[in-house]
Amino acid sequence: MFELSPKKAVINDCNKELMNVYKCIKDEKKFEAMCRELNHHETEHSEEYYYEIRNLDRDKRKFNKLADYKRAARTIYLNKACFNGLYRVNSKNEFNVPFGKKTKVNTYDIGNLITVSNYLTMNDIKILNVDFEDSVKDAQKGDFIYFDPPYDSETSIFNSYTEDGFGKEEQRRLAKVYKELSNKGCYVMLSNNNTTLI
C-alpha cells in the first residue's frame, strides 16, 4: 500500500495490537512516545527482559490499562526480538513466541517510520480493527482491495495471529466476499496458497 500511496485508503486487520501500532504511528504525540519506549527496549534488551515484556499480556486487567504507545512499542519490540519475527498468540490471546537469541536488537528505522507517519497523517487513511467483511461493506466499483489472510495449508494448522484463528470457514467466507466484490466492479487481489479449498 505504501508503494502505491493512495490519498484515501482503509487499513484493516483482525490483529488489534498491529492496528494499534498503525494508530500510534499516525498520532504525533503517541508516535514520539512510542519511539522513546522503543529506545528503552533496545537499551534494556536481554532474554530476561524479553520475557518480562512478552508476559505483560498475562494480566489482562493490567495490560488493558497500558498506554497505547507502550503497547505499540511492545508489539514492535517483540516482533524484532522474538524467534524468526513470528507473530503468534495462544487461545487466551497471549503472545507466545520464544526469545530469538539476539544479543542486540534494532527495533526501528526512524527514517522509515517518519515516512510512514507522514503518509498516514497527510492522507485520508482509516485504520480499522474489524472483521474483513465489515471493512469492505462500503466498497464501490473501481475500488482496489487487497486481502492478505493467513494462508490456507493442507500441512500446517498454524493460523494463530489472533485468539480466534482463521480457519477453513473463514477462508470460504473470504472467497465468497472476494467474488461479490469482483462482481461489483472492484479490483480485488488476494495472497494465499494454491489451495483446493477455495
Task: Annotate each PLM feature.
Residues D27-Y146, P150-N159, R173, K179, ...:
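SAM-dependent nucleic-acid methyltransferase catalytic core
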Residues Q171-I198:
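Conserved Class I SAM-dependent methyltransferase catalytic core
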Residues F2-S5, K137-A139, I198:
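Short loop/helix-cap segments at secondary-structure boundaries that form the rim of catalytic
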Residues G167-E169:
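Charged helix-capping and loop-helix junction motifs
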Residues K7-K8, M122-I125, S182-V188:
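Short active-site oxyanion
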Residues M1-E42:
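Conserved S-adenosyl-L-methionine
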Residues S160-G165:
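Short glycine-enriched, charge-decorated loop/helix-capping segments at active-site entrances
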Residues Y22, I76, V188:
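A residue-level signal for conserved active-site and pocket-lining positions in enzyme catalytic cores
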